[in-house]
């Protein structure tokens, strides 16, 4: 995270590989870069690029580039944000196929809140991404986490991610739930 006045740059990188008795059970990676600028106080823009793969979802590569109009309103000790935008998507599957390039609308609503002087933080975001040329082909994702400050800069963050794809690739389930527990040290 890099924040300066009206600009916020966010980079997230993750890679997960799991092997049990010589057999892979997880192999995925994710990279996301976003630039948010609040031009008019409550209104601004988000621009992003993203790349990912997931061996166990037959996803060789998925690349996104897009942008949003972002509207933000304070809420207690947090905020609620709404994003309305569009993105290009390139998707290639391991077994061939995939849709190649397509365009999707991408919309989100996000809620963040803090309690106990910031020792407990919650974030919840929902995304809805219908294909521009076929609204019956859509993806929905809900992501949430609670950050609990334990001591100093050390926190634990239980989190979840639920994804739904109305028209997934052949052999891939329509929905997926991930539950994780992160530990973070902030200095």
Where are these regions (language model features)?
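Outer-membrane beta-barrel "beta-signal"
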Residues: 175-187
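Repeated loop/turn-to-beta-strand initiation elements of outer-membrane beta-barrel proteins
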Residues: 3-11, 41-47, 76-80, 114-122, ...
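Detector for outer-membrane/organellar transmembrane beta-barrel domains
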Residues: 66, 70, 79-130
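Gram-negative (and chloroplast) outer-membrane scaffold detector with strong preference
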Residues: 37, 41-55, 59-89
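Transmembrane beta-barrel strands of outer-membrane/channel proteins
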Residues: 11-17, 31, 47-51, 67, ...
């Amino acid at each position: 995270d890099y924040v300066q006045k009206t600009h916020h740059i966010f980079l997230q990188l993750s890679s997960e590989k799991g092997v049990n008795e010589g057999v892979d059970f997880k192999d995925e990676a994710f990279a996301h870069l976003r630039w948010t600028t609040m031009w008019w106080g409550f209104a601004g823009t988000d621009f992003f690029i993203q790349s990912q793969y997931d061996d166990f979802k037959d996803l060789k590569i998925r690349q996104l580039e897009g942008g949003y109009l972002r509207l933000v309103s304070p809420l207690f000790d947090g905020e609620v944000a709404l994003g309305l935008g569009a993105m290009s998507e390139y998707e290639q599957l391991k077994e061939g196929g995939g849709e190649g390039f397509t365009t999707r609308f991408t919309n989100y609503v996000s809620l963040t809140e803090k309690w106990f002087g910031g020792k407990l933080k919650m974030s919840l975001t929902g995304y809805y991404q219908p294909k521009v040329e076929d609204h019956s082909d859509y993806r929905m994702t809900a992501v949430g986490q609670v950050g609990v400050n334990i001591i100093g800069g050390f926190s634990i963050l239980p989190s979840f991610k639920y994804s739904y794809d109305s028209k997934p690739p052949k052999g891939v389930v329509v929905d997926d739930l991930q539950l994780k527990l992160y530990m973070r040290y902030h200095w």
